[in-house]
Design a protein with these regions (language model features):
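Short, well-formed alpha-helical segments that are part of the catalytic scaffolds
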Residues: 20-35
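A conserved acidic beta->alpha catalytic loop
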Residues: 50-59
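Glycine-rich, basic loop-to-helix element that forms the pyrophosphate-binding segment
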Residues: 73-91
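Short beta-strand-to-loop acidic/aromatic patch adjacent to the donor-nucleotide binding site
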Residues: 95-107
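Non-catalytic, C-terminal membrane-associated alpha-helical segments of glycosyltransferases
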Residues: 217-273
């Protein structure tokens, strides 16, 4: 084979969705627009988990995008479980060169995929940097003090957001799937930390890859709800402070894990807002 011949690159795109049909369809439309900007040698296959949707999201996806592999579940997988179901289905189907995590609410710019692949490397996870509708950084990567980093930043990424992430086969073969303990939140942070602990790097795209608003509001810190309701929300499957405890214990220290666990409870019991 000649050195200038182009090799086909096969990429599995992983997504999980729950009851936001219109958002999902817009997200997929923006994804395929970005695909159209890529060279013909790049081949994308989407594996999308319908996590027990009752609004017909999965059926709408199959009708609009029959090429998407829709995997229906009974529900209750949340983000981490749903992404792992998609990932397992993809890895059983083919030994892909890359895997992409894609949030269905990510409205990608046409240049998004070009942006993540222009900084690709076999020893690197690429996290796409997003902006909100006021053009402030919303997702991508954070410093150790949880400050969001701008596109192209060379500062070390400590916390990686999972909105649009490119993972090479080499790293997947080393790290495997998302830790099943992190059923919803924390799975992206944990995966990035595991990568760094295995001497891989996390880099950010040089440009914004799309638009998505922050989802920082924690209802269990809202003093307008009665205490019993706040505590119920805090100890729900998605928000249980034991999840954050494990993340900090696993990657930081027991002291920091206890601190974050205690703070979550204190701020819920004595909310400021």
């Amino acid at each position: 084979m000649k050195n200038n011949e182009v090799h086909d690159i096969k990429i599995a795109v992983l997504a999980t969705v729950f009851n936001r049909k219109d958002v999902t369809l817009r997200g997929l439309q923006s994804f395929y627009t970005s695909v159209s900007e890529m060279p013909d040698s790049y081949h994308f296959e989407i594996y999308l988990v319908d996590d027990g949707c009752t609004d017909g999201t999965g059926d709408a996806v199959m009708a609009s995008y029959p090429e998407v592999n829709v995997i229906k579940s009974k529900g209750g997988l949340y983000w981490g479980g749903g992404m792992n179901e998609a990932w397992k289905a993809a890895s059983k189907e083919y030994d892909y060169d890359y895997y992409i995590w894609l949030n269905d609410d990510a409205e990608l710019y046409p240049s998004a995929l070009k942006s993540i692949f222009e900084v690709k490397d076999n020893d690197v996870i690429v996290s796409g940097v997003f902006e909100d509708n006021e053009h402030h950084i919303s997702y991508g990567g954070k410093t150790e003090k949880k400050v969001l980093l701008p596109p192209g930043s060379k500062e070390e990424v400590f916390y990686m957001n999972g909105n649009l992430v490119l993972i090479p086969r080499k790293i997947f073969n080393k790290l495997g799937y998302i830790d099943s303990w992190f059923i919803h939140g924390g799975g992206d942070y944990d995966y990035g930390m595991r990568a760094k602990e295995n001497e891989f790097r996390i880099v950010l795209t040089n440009d914004f890859v799309g638009m998505t608003d922050r989802h920082d509001e924690k209802s269990f810190y809202n003093k307008n709800y009665p205490l019993f309701k706040r505590m119920k929300m805090l100890y729900s499957k998605k928000n249980n402070p034991a999840i954050a405890f494990k993340l900090y214990y696993k990657h930081r220290s027991l002291i920091e894990a206890i601190k974050i666990f205690a703070l979550r409870n204190i701020k819920t019991i004595f909310p400021k807002h």
